């Protein structure tokens, strides 16, 4: 069973991590997969919250949950990322974070739907490939509802429209419990992708729902 909800009290970038964590844990329901929308949040604050929730879910002290949100402008490096994939021309208003997720460099910012599934796979299917393919399939099906022909690309992660990536993915699993997740480009400022080699891939580009449809879509509408 799936339960979707937003928090009773509005959140913003100034809401501290302890308050956000307390509201999430108080609202999550047992025996369902919980979905929650947190609005726009700073990356490091949410990384801290992710790690705290991950410990709870991993030890069966909290049900599995998917956090939906947007971030302020930030470039994040995966554990083994090549730092040369970020070009010197990146905007001054962009934060840089070295993360513990898998994958290479990626960008997060306004106009992207970020999804952090913190899921104990011991209660589902203990398979990394199953988990990644499931995330990809959910995004593909969502995009199909907007008449966007999206699919996987052989040998690559994420979701693609022809030769352009529309959704990047990078996760971390510990004791079969996931954290980090995906970034779906809805209507972000695409200039931020010009300052890096997205996911370390030279041969293909990046696109967004706005680029494909030529119309703006509210991020929260996708959830």
Language model segments and positions:
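C-terminal accessory segment of soluble enzyme catalytic cores
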Residues: 191-223
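N-terminal lobe of the biotin/lipoate ligase/transferase fold
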Residues: 1-160, 165-166
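Short conserved catalytic/interaction loops centered on acidic-Pro-aromatic/His motifs
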Residues: 148-153, 179-180, 191-196
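Short, structured patches in soluble enzyme cores that scaffold and shape functional sites
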Residues: 117-119, 173, 184-188, 210-213
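Short, conserved beta-strand/beta-arch hydrophobic-aromatic motifs that form part
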Residues: 80-86, 95, 169-186, 190
